[in-house]
A protein has these predicted regions:
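Non-catalytic cap/lid and distal C-terminal segments of serine-dependent acyl enzymes
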Residues: 1-222
Length: 222
């Protein structure tokens, strides 16, 4: 059996939107991104860059509670995250790869802070090539996270050209696939696994469901 633990906030969508900005980001946004976030009532006034604190909460406070109440494995844990959650999962993978056996990284915001998270990729590669860690990592994204399909309407007040330019700049598919390919090229020990899946016909939001389905099969092989 597997135990699935979800972490929520319980104080309304605006509170959750602001709090996740702090909890799930490892660094500050670039000025242009910050301006856009400040223009939204859901994220205006949010703080950022507290991913390490949130990781400590999960491992030092939440994990002991789970282990005390359920017969969970201490050697076969999985971390799943989408969007900012995917960025958070990469932060943990790069800085604390031993914290989880499997990482399910869906539509990660790799471009956050000018792609600052990729500056720590080499830390993981060094540990892989030293034979110190052997994580299993599935990176996923939706096909239409980088290409605006004909049947998808852009946001109100935004032209198709502007929307496509934004998707191109985010480079979700390119970044996700590229990271998986680089990690696969590392001389990792037996047991390590790196895989990318791009879901045909899916957007940033609709990619969540196939990511969960394929992620469960990846984390819990028969």
């Amino acid at each position: 059996p597997a135990y699935i633990v979800g972490i929520g906030y319980g104080k309304g969508w605006e509170h959750a939107s602001r709090t996740r900005c702090a909890d799930l980001t490892p660094s500050q946004p670039d000025p242009a991104t910050l301006a856009g976030l400040e223009a939204s009532p859901l994220t205006k006034g949010a703080t950022y860059g507290e991913a390490e604190r949130y990781h400590r909460f999960m491992t030092e406070e939440l994990r002991p509670v789970i282990e005390a109440g359920y017969p969970v494995s201490r050697s076969d844990r999985t971390l799943w995250g989408h969007s900012f959650g995917g960025l958070f999962a990469l932060h943990v993978l790069f800085h604390h790869p031993e914290a989880y056996r499997t990482y399910l990284v869906n539509s990660p915001s790799i471009n956050w802070g000018g792609g600052a998270i990729l500056g720590y990729e080499s830390k993981l590669v060094a540990q892989l090539e030293a034979g110190k860690v052997a994580p299993r990592v599935l990176l996923t994204a939706g096909e239409y996270e980088e290409r605006l399909a004909d049947h998808i309407k852009p946001y109100p007040g935004v032209t198709r050209e502007q929307m496509q330019a934004a998707l191109t700049a985010f480079a979700m598919v390119t970044n996700t696939r590229g990271l998986a390919e680089r990690l696969k090229a590392a001389k990792a020990p037996a047991g390590a696994q790196f895989q990318a899946m791009i879901f045909e016909g899916e957007t940033h939001l609709s990619a969540i469901m196939p990511a969960m389905s394929r992620g469960l099969r990846f984390a819990l092989p028969a």
